[in-house]
């Protein structure tokens, strides 16, 4: 489903594939050769979303930009990136050739330099910068500029260093910050989506006609299979690293 938001509407390259059950709304630009799979949500709320060429957004991933009168958090994703199933990315800048695995979360103002990655369930927090080629291990937390990587049990320490509500919602971190953030965000969202309208157009790329005797071209399904293969290799590599770490601990 493709929706306009006021005068803003998505721009999808003619060679990109958008699944019928994906949702794209507002000032979103999707580059050549991209694949946006079923259930993915890409929404521009007051700031633009830009996705570079040959990037894959997998099932049920949520990509958002956010911007109001006080702060702007556009979302920029480079070329040849993979955003895995159920990943959540908002208001960040992601360079070329990055890998964002299943269930990862990347928050406002974060920056992933070229070739960096976030493994399963990893978090890149507000205003954090991952250096070129750097990786966040499974379920670990990256915070700071440049990033320091923390294990899951250090989450309270990271939280104590952050000013999440001030940075994201412009709300001071007092006792009622959660309630005030909800009220502020609700007002913003109602205004941002008040003029949403479903557009008739839908981008579902069809293969070019073949001449008699020609081999069939690679299909969208084959391309998705390659992406899944890459993700499985990533999982296997992480498991090997985990087992090696366990052996080292036992040996020590």
Where in the sequence are the language-model features?
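Extended, small-residue-rich solenoid/repeat segments and analogous flexible loops
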Residues: 1-33, 41
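Short Cys/His-rich Zn2+-coordinating modules
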Residues: 15-17, 36-37, 79, 100
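Short HxH-centered metal-ligating active-site micro-motif
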Residues: 82
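Intrinsically disordered, compositionally biased tail regions
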Residues: 234-252
């Amino acid at each position: 489903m493709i929706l306009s938001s006021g005068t803003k509407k998505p721009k999808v390259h003619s060679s990109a594939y958008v699944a019928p059950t994906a949702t794209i709304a507002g000032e979103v630009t999707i580059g050549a050769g991209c694949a946006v799979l079923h259930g993915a949500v890409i929404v521009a709320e007051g700031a633009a979303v830009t996705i570079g060429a040959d990037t894959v957004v997998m099932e049920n991933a949520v990509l958002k930009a956010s911007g109001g009168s006080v702060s702007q958090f556009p979302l920029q994703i480079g070329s040849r990136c993979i955003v895995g199933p159920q990943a959540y990315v908002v208001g960040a800048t992601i360079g070329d050739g990055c890998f964002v695995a299943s269930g990862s979360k990347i928050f406002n103002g974060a920056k992933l330099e070229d070739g960096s990655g976030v493994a399963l369930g990893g978090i890149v927090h507000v205003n954090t910068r991952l250096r070129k080629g750097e990786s966040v291990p499974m379920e670990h937390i990256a915070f700071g500029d440049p990033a320091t990587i923390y294990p899951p049990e250090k989450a309270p320490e990271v939280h104590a260093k952050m000013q999440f509500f001030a940075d994201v919602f412009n709300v001071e971190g007092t006792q009622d910050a959660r309630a005030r953030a909800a009220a502020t965000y609700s007002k913003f969202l109602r205004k941002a989506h008040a003029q949403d309208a479903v557009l008739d157009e839908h981008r579902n790329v069809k293969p070019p006609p073949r001449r008699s005797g020609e081999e069939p071209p690679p299909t969208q399904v084959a391309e998705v299979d390659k992406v899944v293969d890459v993700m499985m290799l990533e999982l296997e590599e992480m498991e090997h690293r985990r087992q090696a770490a366990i052996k080292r601990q036992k040996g020590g």
